[in-house]
Amino acid sequence: YNIGANVRNSLIASGCIINGDVENSIIFKKAYIGNNCVIKNSIILNDVYIGDNTVIENCIVESRDTIRANTKHIGEPGEIKIIIEKNERYVL
């Protein structure tokens, strides 16, 4: 974790770089989470890059995906939002 990172109630795999806030989430190997990001109630799979100032809540981010900076991806209660290479779909 870098200075300013805040991780609560989460599992973080080896090789990750965390610069933002992570809460109630699972982060797989070699994920990069940019500055001022907020990750809540989500699963971030292997080799994911999340740009600065991004919010991800109630989502699963597919392996080797890149999430652009300054974006928001928020799933609705009772749904899981899956993010795959800039396409989004909903699964109950």
Cite the ranges covered by each PLM segment.
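Left-handed beta-helix
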Residues: 1-92
